[in-house]
Swiss-Prot record:
Protein name as catalogued: S-adenosylmethionine synthase
Organism of origin: Pectobacterium atrosepticum (strain SCRI 1043 / ATCC BAA-672) (Erwinia carotovora subsp. atroseptica)
CDD domains referenced in this protein's UniProt entry, alphabetically: S-AdoMet_synt
One example of a Gene Ontology biological process annotation: one-carbon metabolic process
EC nos: 2.5.1.6
Biological classification of the source: Bacteria, Pseudomonadati, Pseudomonadota, Gammaproteobacteria, Enterobacterales
Residues where K(+) binds: E43
List of residues binding ATP: H15, D164, A165, K166, R230, F231, D239, R245, K246, A262, K266
Family per record: Belongs to the AdoMet synthase family.
Task performed by this protein: Catalyzes the formation of S-adenosylmethionine (AdoMet) from methionine and ATP. The overall synthetic reaction is composed of two sequential steps, AdoMet formation and the subsequent tripolyphosphate hydrolysis which occurs prior to release of AdoMet from the enzyme.
Amino acid sequence: MAKHLFTSESVSEGHPDKIADQISDAVLDAILEQDPKARVACETYVKTGMVLVGGEITTSAWVDIEEITRRTVRDIGYVNSEMGFDANSCAVLSAIGKQSPDINQGVDRRDPLEQGAGDQGLMFGYATNETDVLMPAPVTYAHRLVHRQSEVRKSGSLPWLRPDAKSQVTFLYDDGKIAGIDAVVLSTQHSEDVSQKDLHEAVMEEIIKPVLPAEWLSASTKYFINPTGRFVIGGPMGDCGLTGRKIIVDTYGGAARHGGGAFSGKDPSKVDRSAAYAARYVAKNIVAAGLADRCEIQVSYAIGVAEPTSIMIETFGTEKVSNEQLTLLVREFFDLRPYGLIQMLDLLHPIYQETAAYGHFGREHFPWEKTDKAAQLREAAGL
């Protein structure tokens, strides 16, 4: 394979779409804390001065949607009108109904093992051994850049930083291996009182250099720091935000295929979310076991049916055993029925708000990032 470039992006917790994702998942967590069997599909829209929370929720719990919304926006850092959005004064509107009984009858079963999928759909999981967290490097470092922006903003060391930010990293690959970083883009919202010179220098020294490994940077690496020259108006004042609009940022940065379903605001009965987590778990364990250097898995479901309608493995020529054998191993060691994967990954807990910014994958404390099946897979494969 010749040299090639590959790029991924990320956005900070203060990006409008990510504000929406975090509010949706904060509502989900608050409900799951009281009612683990709740059915939640919570969508959020944010724009200057307002938040609209809607969706279908069936639960025995009562939660204060307005308080959850304000607390989430406050924790992100939008706490005064100078930023264009203020947790204390924005309007919070609610338009929530109940889940359709037609859907519910296909999901709930007397035998929980026969719990049907909450919808049809296809999901992908992916892993690669090019980073220590078995994730593609471009999206991993794009996340780390905006996470670092948040850290230095919240610590007060760069007091002119504001919550909205975006990053993009272009890696150079040679014969499929990382050869360096070709380009870095970092745009951050800021207050009026910082010069572009000071901003460029501080972003370079306090955000970019501490995050990106020096051995991948060279004299030819290109840096684009706030390339428009000004980013004062940001957050919901600059753009409206919606739940589920950053599905590539949430997953693999474009390095793997995507089934199209978003994650945030959905309880684990929605296979858009839970089966995508399970697919990541499967792919990561296959790579951790040394059965392939790269692994992508597709699973699909029919609404109301427990068993997946298909399982497909792709290893891009890096497999140590055949893809047919890998598929048999997946069926043997992983229960990909909705109830089975919920139990396998212990998903009925309020763990979701934290997933809603900086990526759902590659963060080791989430249960779908465990590699506890790797040794069994390796032994069963005869390696």
